[in-house]
A protein has these predicted regions:
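Acidic, glycine-rich two-metal-ion catalytic cores of nucleic acid-processing enzymes
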Residues: 139-232
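N-terminal leader/targeting and assembly helices and adjacent pre-domain segments
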Residues: 1-153, 229-232
Length: 232
């Protein structure tokens, strides 16, 4: 991610004179290049997550990973990463506009970005920019487009959560597949922690056919599965 952010900052250098008016779309070529770089970032993250997930499988096929990166609550892992990269785009655009107005050089801007990437709106100069109507960067002119959407402020944490979900889904898929190969027809779920979670508690109340996968209940779910036999 550092290298791709560095490339974006370099591409933006010729547009310093735009100052308050800076947006990625001040140039069609710049806009396309930034989008291309962020697509590459999203693809690279997904490949990394898939590679790590593949290490959890005992099979030569990739069914578990295909399942884990597939549709969940209306979005695939790729779509979730694309969404977070789109969020990163707007945040970078705002930071770069601020850096041009305040006269930061590229290294100062990069240092600020990396320092505050876990809390992108924690940069002290951000609050001042939000109340300055001269800025044209989308996120500064219109506010956070993801406010009240349930998404975390931290782009890094959001992307990491996608990876956790892929790995957790793969692990659970493999656990249930092993039971199926052993002839188990139904399984149950038990809590793997005492952290309060009504959704996990509800899932643990029932047993399920081996063809139905109900775990993980959420990306950081640590619930465990166990075989259920007819005489249990």
């Amino acid at each position: 991610m550092r290298k791709k952010i560095d490339v974006i900052l370099t591409l933006c250098e010729p547009y310093r004179n735009y100052g308050y008016s800076f947006r990625f779309d001040v140039s069609g070529d710049l806009d396309k290049d930034v989008n291309r770089i962020l697509v590459l970032l999203s693809d690279a993250l997904l490949e990394d997550f898939k590679s790590r997930a593949q290490g959890l499988t005992q099979k030569d096929d990739d069914k578990a990973v295909v399942y884990a990166t597939g549709m969940r609550n209306g979005m695939t892992a790729q779509q979730r990463l694309d969404r977070h990269c789109s969020r990163l785009r707007y945040i970078l655009e705002g930071w770069i506009a601020i850096s041009f107005v305040l006269g930061w050089n590229k290294q100062q801007t990069k240092a600020k970005i990396m320092r505050y990437l876990n809390n992108p709106f924690g940069i002290p100069e951000w609050a001042d920019a939000l109340f300055d109507s001269r800025y044209m960067a989308t996120i500064l002119a219109e506010g956070d487009l993801n406010r009240r959407t349930g998404l975390m402020n931290s782009i890094l944490a959001s992307m990491s959560l996608v990876g956790e979900g892929v790995i957790n889904d793969t692990y659970c898929y493999e656990a249930i597949r092993k039971m199926a190969e052993a002839g188990v027809e139904r399984y149950g779920v038990r809590r793997g922690s005492d952290f309060p979670c009504n959704a996990c508690d509800e899932v643990c109340l029932h047993t399920y056919p081996i063809t139905q996968i109900v775990v993980p209940v959420h990306p950081r779910c640590v619930c465990q599965t166990f075989p259920v036999y007819s005489d249990d």
